[in-house]
Amino acid sequence: MTIGQSCFDRAIALFDAANGEDPRMDKGPDGKDVPRELLYAQRMTDMIGRFAPTAPEAAQLAVRAQHIQRWKVPRDSYPMDRDGYLQWRTGLYKFHAETAGRLMKEAGYDDATIDRVKQAVGKRGLKVNADTQLLEDVADLVFIEHYMLGFAGQKPDYTEEK
């Protein structure tokens, strides 16, 4: 095992332990309850493996950390309007990036790799940063495959155009 691989394995284990604390549960592929953000992270990793199997390590880490401990920043902690939603999303980007960076430091990663992952998770440089764009592409594919129908079912006022 290389030094990088051992850091990678430690970081994934730390991300999974953090997401394993999620009190909200969803059904996993075997029908058993799985902490929601842990399941999401696993789905993200599965998708990047299918969509971009040779993705750089930083991108693989970023997709695993995309929603790390998301439940700690509830939507209703911001105003329940469009501006509040945008503030919540921006706050989440920073929260996820900082949390991922802290755990990566604990796993033994260097500052350059941590910064690269934080940029992607923090949604910086979308359309010009390949890691950020790949993260967004993978998130879109995961949404389509696992969440779109449920989301649409909760939004009967959404038209096809919307």
Question: What kind of region is each of these model predictions?
Answer:
Residues 63, 110-154:
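Histidine/acidic-rich helix-loop-helix segments that form or flank divalent-metal centers
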Residues 78-99, 155-162:
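Divalent-cation-assisted or electrostatically stabilized phosphate/pyrophosphate-binding catalytic cores
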Residues 57-76, 80, 100, 119-125, ...:
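His-Asp-centered metal-binding catalytic motifs of divalent-metal-dependent phosphohydrolases/nucleases
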Residues 9, 60, 94-98:
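A broad detector of short, well-ordered amphipathic alpha-helices
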Residues 7-45, 78-87, 91:
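Active-site flanking loop/helix segments enriched in acidic
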Residues 1-6:
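Sequence termini and other peripheral, non-core segments
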Residues 36, 52-57, 129-136, 157:
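Structural motif
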